[in-house]
């Protein structure tokens, strides 16, 4: 069965695993999802991730991060740009998430980067999601 929004599926799996206090969550892998996990790790929202090869597309295993082993580091993770309603911003209109406490992840010509990196580089793009 085809999936209309694989990024929303990934974010929902992470959100649900956080609420269930799971240590890890398995997600069908793709290059975009691996890049998104890389940004989440660099920003300190997840512990780690790894790609497990299988006979099909592979599995992205995301290790979740908690504060004092009980409270999730990710309070909210939200999809912004959706397949039916894309959200593009210029370099001067990049949103600030929770007054800088969270991050917006953008898909730009320089790859997936955070809102802060996009402002510094002076590039705009598609706002994939916000995390805080």
UniProtKB/Swiss-Prot annotation:
Give GO terms: molecular function aspect only: rRNA binding; structural constituent of ribosome
The organism's place on the tree of life at top rank: Bacteria
GO aspect biological process, one term: translation
Q: Does the keyword Transport apply?
A: no
Fetch the PROSITE patterns from UniProt: RIBOSOMAL_S8
Stretch forming the signal peptide: none
Instruction: Name any one Pfam family assigned in the record.
Output: Ribosomal_S8
GO cellular component, alphabetical, reads: cytosolic small ribosomal subunit
KW Plastid (keyword) present: no
Sorted alphabetically, the keyword list is: Ribonucleoprotein, Ribosomal protein, RNA-binding, rRNA-binding
* Family according to the record: Belongs to the universal ribosomal protein uS8 family.
State how it assembles.
Part of the 30S ribosomal subunit. Contacts proteins S5 and S12.
What job does the chain carry out?
One of the primary rRNA binding proteins, it binds directly to 16S rRNA central domain where it helps coordinate assembly of the platform of the 30S subunit.
Q: What is this protein called?
A: Small ribosomal subunit protein uS8
Native source species: Geobacter sulfurreducens (strain ATCC 51573 / DSM 12127 / PCA)
